[in-house]
Amino acid sequence: MGVRGLTSYIAQRAEIYLKPHELHSTALVIDGDNLSCNLYKDVTGSYSAFGGDYDDFYRAVVQFFQVLAECNIRPYVLMDGGYEERKLRTVSTRLRNKISVIKKINPNASITLFPLHLKEVFVDAVRDCGVPVMRCVFEADDELAALARKLNCPVLSYDSDFYIHNVKYIPLITLTVKVLTKQVKDKNSSNQKDSRDLRHCEAKNVKKRTRANKIVTGIQTTGLTASTKGSSKTYKYLDCCIYRVSHLCGRGTLSPEKLPLFAALLGNDYIARSAFKNFFAAGMGKAGRSRKLKLQQKRIQVILTWLKEETAESALAKVLSRLKKNQRDSLVSQVNAAISGYSNELCHAYDYFDEHYENAFPYIEPVSEEECSDDEHSSSSDEKFSDVEEGEDQEEADNQDEEQQEENQDVDSGDEEEEEADEGLELEVEDKTLLFPQWFLDKLYPAHLPRSFVDLMHLRKYINNPQIEHFPFHDSNEVALPILNYVFALLHHVECEKIELPLEVDMDIEGSTVPYLTYLTRALRVTNVRYFKMPIEKKPAYPFDPLSPDARHLRAVFEDNAPNADTEKLFSKLDQLPEDLRLYFLAIIYWLHRSEHCDLLHLHSLILSLVVLRTIDVTIPAEREVKTFLKRFGKTLKAERAVRDKEAAEGIKRGIKPALLELSVPDRMAHVPKSDCYLTQERLLPHFHMQEIFKKKFDLYSTTVIHAFAEFQAVVYQLNGLNSLLDFPLLSPRMNQLYCGAFLYNMYDVLRNRADVRYHVENFLLPDSKLMFDFYCYLYDWCAEFIPTWKRLEVDPTAAKALQKKRLKKQRQAARKVELREAIADPNAEMVEDADPENDFFDLNNKFCALKVA
């Protein structure tokens, strides 16, 4: 949810509110959505403009949890679910902001846009590490806090909500993901670091990293750390800072029951900050004249000072007296909900982990004496606070424009308050899992279903996540809308379940009440959010029993929406593909038939990407930096290249071993030699990075090429959602082994002007591995049977045009050479050639010429 301005406020006063901490041998509750977004931001950088490099992101997640395992940290990952009704206004605002970024995107932009499959790839990596993971029904904040209180362990996140929760909180910005080693000392001295304050340089580093918004600067394991000398016992730990609510509620400042009101006054996703403008104007006076602080920072100081002199009841009464009547109930319900969440003991995650994981809780710590005496350590915070305020740098002197911008946002949001107040309050239920049937929770908790399914069930809405796409085209998810509509129909036509009256019905047809889906997406060509209602087109083709779903629903989607694909033949030939590729290639065929913007070069690029990622990254260590790759494997590359050059000089042609020829082409891929992978990776490694030309001429970057790939991602996402709802009749695609946005774009660019794509792949992209080339041909030939007739072109028109240009260029060059040769020729050359060599020549000016001997 987020409390506006509180993260920056704490970071600027890190010496007061944060304490150094050694993280090891403990449980750790992790905010999965927050961690995934911050890891992706640090790993990919500017490459988010190409639609997602899932391979790099997956490896970063795995490395992160390997570091935790080295320090004997038992993590528990909780993922967010759907949106609550009261947060839709904020969701719409964020969606509009993202649309404006997409409209102006260029590959050099520093803004990170999260790809569609980010959370699914993160969950795959977490599962592969053996870490317990669960998806909550709605936002995971309360569940995170409840689980952390039960286990008496910290929460790892980067969300200002946890500054007001009654939990131990480790801001992700303070975590150094580098394993450190320390000697075990006596118990008293080992606890000294937790009790001391941050040094000035440490606090300054926290502020610097907060401003740079950098979370993980480099993940390092013990392989890079020096071992300690001697035989004394050691332990490994991660350096970080920890926060407890007692640091903010020190003696003489706030009491815990005032924290929910404090957070509401600052503004969050559920209540507009401008709702309190009358209160700030009349009840609290000016927020100070200091130009060193942002407006929100001044507001926090004033609120803290004012709440110090008030009780929780009197403060709430004074705030309510300055609100409009139609806003009072909303604030009271929000404060009450926050108070209940502050000490909530209802924890579904604890029960789920205990039931589904063996030895789920090896670390459950009792409350220590140090935590009970935190109030004593924080009693001097008021004195330190004044010292820090006097010594603040003038590093925010340029914040006048930001203050004006905040004021403008307050004015704009004030216009929306009347609409928000008229919507009515959402029905508050203490246990929100009661809003959903048990079969749905059984599929949701293991994170098998995407979070959007909660919105489909609860709100009957779908908030489309716009991708990097061509702005003048319709949104990339439009080609997958029939699949989404079918999923919505299944969720609301469950066998043996009482059908409740829909929240929203379509009354266009007299006498019928058909539930419809509200679809939120970007409007065409303008920076705005488009709402439109999408009724269920028709009932599912087969009954839907959630406990034993019918796999034929997948076939029904193709029969209805890709009739030219010969569905019977398509599904009968799926057995010829590896199990992990079947759903992926179903998505490819659907995309080829539904998309107007894809061509066969997109298909070639997709197949090349999966062949390379699925083979090379599994066989040899994954390395994307060219210099590092050559440094690590340069000797191997040189030796193998020498062997192959010698064989080529002797006329020996490398082939496939006879034993492998007996296997099918897909089965041979498990036997690809490492030497093939090293040489192929060396050749293809530059294509995993953004082209240098984009740094000078970013207008050469083509969003039309990206748009077709974005449509494909949407098809995979929706088809995989349907597959998970049907209990996985086909294996879910592992996007980290299939899709790399930068590589796909570069492959398309390389193949764009090739008259014979297969020849170019064989001789220039995969010449070092016959097995990989055969697999590429095998997959393309499998798809060729189902390519729509209107896309079957023997020669791509772009390539044909390029070939014609080359021919004309050669003809012009030949004509120029002829003209040049004629221009410099000797005019008497013909006379010399035609002269009779028998006729002697006598030079009259040379008296000795007649003496010439014959």
UniProtKB/Swiss-Prot annotation:
Q: What tissue expression does the UniProt record report for this protein?
A: Expressed in the proliferative tissues of embryos and in the mitotically active tissue anterior to the morphogenetic furrow in eye imaginal disks.
Basic and acidic residues bias spans: 375-387
Query: Which CDD domains does the annotation name?
Result: PIN_asteroid-like
Which InterPro entries does the record cross-reference, listed alphabetically? Asteroid (IPR026832), PIN-like_dom_sf (IPR029060)
Protein's UniProt keywords contain Cell inner membrane: no
Provide the alphabetized UniProt keywords.
Developmental protein
Q: Does the keyword Lyase apply?
A: no
Which superkingdom, per the lineage?
Eukaryota
Q: Which GO terms describe its biological process?
A: compound eye morphogenesis; compound eye photoreceptor fate commitment; imaginal disc-derived wing morphogenesis; imaginal disc-derived wing vein morphogenesis; larval somatic muscle development
Where composition is biased (Acidic residues), the residues are 388-427
Q: Where is this region: Disordered?
A: 368-427
Xref: PANTHER family: ASTEROID PROTEIN (PTHR15665), PROTEIN ASTEROID HOMOLOG 1 (PTHR15665:SF1)
| Family in the record | Belongs to the asteroid family.
The task this protein performs is described as:
May function in EGF receptor signaling. May play a role in compound eye morphogenesis.
Q: What is this protein called?
A: Protein asteroid
- Source species: Drosophila melanogaster (Fruit fly)
